[in-house]
Amino acid sequence: LCELLECEPYLSGNVGSGSVEELAKWVEYITAEGGTLAELRAKNGRKEPWSLKYLGVGNESWGCGGNMRPEYYSDLYRRYATYCRNYDGSVLYKVASGASDYDYNWTKVLMNNIDLDQMDGISLHYYTVKGWDGSKGSATDFDTEWWYNMISKAVEVEEVIENHKAIMDAYDPKK
């Protein structure tokens, strides 16, 4: 699909229930020129390796990705990031599972506990859903009150981004 759309893939690795070995093998399967996993990829219909530029090390680790504390996730991130590399020689940008909305402490802990040479980015999760009670609402069938609620929350995203950026800049002003 990414080749058809001419865009870069983003692979999100499972650190909640998957192993370091499993994620490292997925990256090898995708990017290796030769070896057992490249042979398996060819057997599955794809002889040439894919290009992989972005690797998300976990996703929503503060919630459904493991309900982790940022300190614990930071330790896992360092472990997983150590063993994941591209087999085609290109740079693999490793992206940490970032905070949800206004959880600035999550960003501070990650920036403080993960070596900057191991982390190339942090994802941000920000949602403009109706509620977290399991009923996120319809994408097309909503009333005026719901619409205004979503738009007002969307307007706040710039402030959230700027606040997380300020924290990251304090630890790494050159990026």
PLM features per residue range, with description:
Residues 1, 33-47, 78, 102-114:
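Alpha-helical scaffolding within the catalytic cores
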Residues 12-16, 57-60, 97-100, 124-127:
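Active-site-proximal beta-strand/loop segments in catalytic clefts of secreted hydrolases
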Residues 13-34, 116-121:
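Carboxylate/His-rich catalytic cores and anion/metal-binding grooves
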Residues 36-69, 125-136, 175:
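Active-site groove signature of glycoside hydrolases
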Residues 70-175:
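Noncatalytic carbohydrate-binding groove/subsite architecture in carbohydrate-active enzymes
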